[in-house]
């Protein structure tokens, strides 16, 4: 699939077939994430691959209910997918210069770096016929305990990964005219 076609056709997947994801396919997807750009090439993103049912269930239990919608639909996806990938960031690298924050964004640059890497990952997965969904509403402390994450790392995101049970229909998107301004905010 061409890149733009993959972007247009990718959907958030929460229901998966039981079919396993082989190591070769998984490594292609992880390699796409590894190649993502990062602040000053710090490459602060790390990935933890989980296949264990016990650990996937513990991660699913860490997912928080949505304040307005109730149960988070990602919970079932984390339990059912053959693979879950957790993305973490090494703190104090991204957005730093000579050991100090380089901008007023401080240590939050790692969120951008992980986001870029994870988008590479989900697009590569979609290109290979696999499904994912970005999951960020979870109890970070619980996930850190489950996965034995050191203090100098931060859990940013996780995604279930597997073959979709079905392909959801496209969700509505805002028109470019609604989201693009010229020269300054609000100027069409």
Predicted regions and their residues:
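Short amphipathic alpha-helical segments
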Residues: 1, 23-31, 57
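C-terminal helix-cap and adjacent tail motif
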Residues: 3-12, 157-188
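A short N-terminal beta-strand-loop micro-motif at the entrance of redox/enzyme domains
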Residues: 12-28
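Small-aliphatic-rich amphipathic alpha-helix that forms the alpha element of a beta-alpha
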Residues: 29, 33, 85, 102-146
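Glycine-rich, charged/polar anion/phosphate-binding loops
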Residues: 31-35, 69-72
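Glycine/small-residue-rich phosphate/adenosyl-binding loop
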Residues: 41-114
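A glycine-rich helix N-cap at a beta->alpha junction
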Residues: 75-81, 148-170
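Short secondary-structure boundary segments
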Residues: 89, 137, 163
């Amino acid at each position: 699939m061409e890149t733009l076609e993959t972007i247009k056709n990718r959907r958030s997947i929460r229901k998966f077939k039981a079919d396993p994801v082989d190591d070769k396919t998984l490594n292609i997807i992880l390699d796409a994430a590894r190649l993502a750009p990062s602040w000053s090439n710090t490459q602060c993103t790390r990935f933890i691959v989980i296949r264990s049912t016990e650990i996937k269930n513990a991660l699913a239990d860490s997912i928080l209910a949505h304040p307005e919608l109730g149960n988070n639909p990602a919970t079932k996806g984390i339990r059912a997918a053959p693979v879950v990938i957790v993305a973490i960031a090494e703190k104090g690298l991204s957005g730093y210069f000579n050991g100090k924050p380089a901008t007023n964004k401080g240590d939050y640059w790692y969120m951008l770096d992980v986001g870029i890497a994870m988008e590479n990952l989900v697009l590569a997965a979609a290109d290979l016929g696999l499904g994912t969904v970005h999951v960020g509403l979870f109890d970070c402390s619980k996930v850190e305990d489950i996965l034995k994450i050191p203090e100098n790392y931060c859990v940013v995101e996780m995604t279930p990964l597997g073959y979709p049970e079905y392909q959801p229909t496209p969700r509505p998107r805002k028109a470019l005219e609604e989201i693009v301004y010229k020269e300054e905010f609000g100027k069409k």
